[in-house]
C-alpha cells in the first residue's frame, strides 16, 4: 500500500480519555511521522506519551479521530495487520518474557504469526546475533542483567521484522552505560534496517539523538522539530517540568559565569570540541 507523502503514521484530530475520567488525555491531536524517522516523544508524567503509543499499536481505542499505519486505517478489520507492522519494547522487559529460555521466548511471537519452523529457527538465530546475545540462547531470561534483558526484548521485536519499533521508556531502568549501549545498538539497527523508531523517554540526552523531537503537554503537541530547534528553548522546557540536555546545562552555566559562548545548541561532542578550543585560546 502506498504511503501518503511518505508518512508511515498519520494521526488526525485524535482524542482519548480513560474510563471513568472526565478529562481527555489526548486532545484533538494531529501528527504525521515519516517512514524511517527516529522520533522522540517527550513530556512530563501524564502528558499522554505512552497513551499515544498504545493508540498507535491498537492497544487502546480512540474516543474520536483517526489513525493510519502504513496506509491502513486503524479499525477492527485492520488491527491485526497493523500490529504485525509494529514492535514494542517496554520499560520492564520481564513483563514481556513468556519463554523458559531466551530462544523460545523470541520464537513465541513467530509461532503466533504462523512462521514455518525452519524460517523461525533462522530468524531467532539472526536476531540474537544482531543484538550480540547469541551466547545466551539457552539461558533463562530472569537470570540476565537489565541491559541483556532489553537486548533480548529487542531481538524478539526484530525477529518479527516490523516496520515501526516503539520504545516505551525502554532505557529508564538501565544504568548510564547500559542506556548508552542500548541506544547505540538501536541507532545502528535503524540505520541498517531502515525501520521507524518512536522513542518515549524522560532521558533528554537520549532525545537529542533523534531526527525529530515532539513535546507533549496536557495532551497536546506544544513543540515539534529537530533537536537543535527544541533544546535551545531551555526556559520553555523547564517551565513544563522537563530537564535540558547536559551540554545545554554546561552552556548555561558558562554564560552565567561571563564566558563568551555562542548562543546556539551544542551536542555533547560539539560542546567538548568548543571547550577544547576555548582552553587552547585561554
Swiss-Prot record:
InterPro entries: AAA+_ATPase, ABC_transporter-like_ATP-bd, ABC_transporter-like_CS, ABC_transpr_CbiO/EcfA_su, ECF_ABC_transporter_ATP-bd, EcfA_1, P-loop_NTPase. Its main location: membrane. ATP binds at residues 43-50. Its EC number is 7.-.-.-. It is a peripheral membrane protein. Pfam families: ABC_tran (PF00005). GO terms for molecular function: ATP binding; ATP hydrolysis activity; ATPase-coupled transmembrane transporter activity. It is found in: Cell membrane. Residues 9-243 form the ABC transporter domain. Keywords: ATP-binding, Cell membrane, Membrane, Nucleotide-binding, Translocase, Transport. CDD domains: ABC_cobalt_CbiO_domain1. GO terms for cellular component: ATP-binding cassette (ABC) transporter complex. The keyword Transmembrane helix does not apply. It is an enzyme of class 7 (translocase). Forms a stable energy-coupling factor (ECF) transporter complex composed of 2 membrane-embedded substrate-binding proteins (S component), 2 ATP-binding proteins (A component) and 2 transmembrane proteins (T component). ATP-binding (A) component of a common energy-coupling factor (ECF) ABC-transporter complex. Unlike classic ABC transporters this ECF transporter provides the energy necessary to transport a number of different substrates. NCBIfam families: ECF_ATPase_1 (TIGR04520), PRK13635.1 (NF010156), PRK13648.1 (NF010167). PANTHER family: ENERGY-COUPLING FACTOR TRANSPORTER ATP-BINDING PROTEIN ECFA1, HEAVY METAL TRANSPORTER. Belongs to the ABC transporter superfamily. Energy-coupling factor EcfA family. This is Energy-coupling factor transporter ATP-binding protein EcfA1. It comes from Ligilactobacillus salivarius (strain UCC118).
Amino acid at each position: 500500500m502506498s504511503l501518503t507523502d511518505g508518512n508511515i503514521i498519520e494521526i488526525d484530530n485524535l482524542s482519548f480519555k480513560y474510563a471513568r475520567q472526565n478529562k481527555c488525555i489526548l486532545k484533538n491531536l494531529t501528527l504525521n511521522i515519516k517512514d524511517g524517522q527516529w522520533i522522540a516523544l517527550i513530556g512530563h508524567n501524564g502528558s499522554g506519551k505512552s497513551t499515544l503509543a498504545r493508540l498507535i499499536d491498537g492497544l487502546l481505542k480512540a474516543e474520536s479521530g483517526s489513525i493510519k499505519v502504513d496506509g491502513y486505517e486503524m479499525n477492527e478489520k485492520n488491527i491485526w495487520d497493523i500490529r504485525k507492522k509494529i514492535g514494542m519494547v517496554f520499560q520492564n522487559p520481564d513483563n514481556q518474557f513468556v519463554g523458559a529460555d531466551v530462544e523460545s521466548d523470541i520464537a513465541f511471537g513467530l509461532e503466533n504469526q504462523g512462521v514455518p519452523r525452519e524460517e523461525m529457527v533462522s530468524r531467532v538465530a539472526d536476531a540474537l546475533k544482531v543484538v550480540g546475545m547469541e551466547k545466551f540462547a539457552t539461558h533463562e531470561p530472569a537470570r540476565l542483567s537489565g541491559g541483556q534483558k532489553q537486548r533480548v526484548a529487542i531481538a524478539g521485536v526484530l525477529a518479527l521484522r516490523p516496520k515501526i519499533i516503539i520504545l516505551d521508556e525502554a532505557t529508564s531502568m538501565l544504568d548510564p552505560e547500559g542506556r548508552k549501549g542500548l541506544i547505540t545498538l538501536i541507532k545502528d539497527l535503524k540505520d541498517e534496517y531502515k525501520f521507524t523508531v518512536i522513542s518515549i523517554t524522560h532521558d533528554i540526552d537520549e532525545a537529542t539523538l533523534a531526527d525529530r523531537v515532539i513535546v507533549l503537554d496536557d495532551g497536546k503537541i506544544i513543540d515539534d522539530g529537530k533537536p537543535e530547534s527544541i533544546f535551545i528553548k531551555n526556559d520553555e522546557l523547564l517551565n513544563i517540568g522537563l530537564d535540558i540536555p547536559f551540554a545545554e546545562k554546561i552552556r548555561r552555566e558558562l554564560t552565567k559565569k561571563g564566558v563568551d559562548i555562542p548562543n546556539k545548541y551544542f551536542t555533547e561532542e560539539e560542546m567538548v570540541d568548543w571547550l577544547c578550543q576555548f582552553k587552547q585560546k585561554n
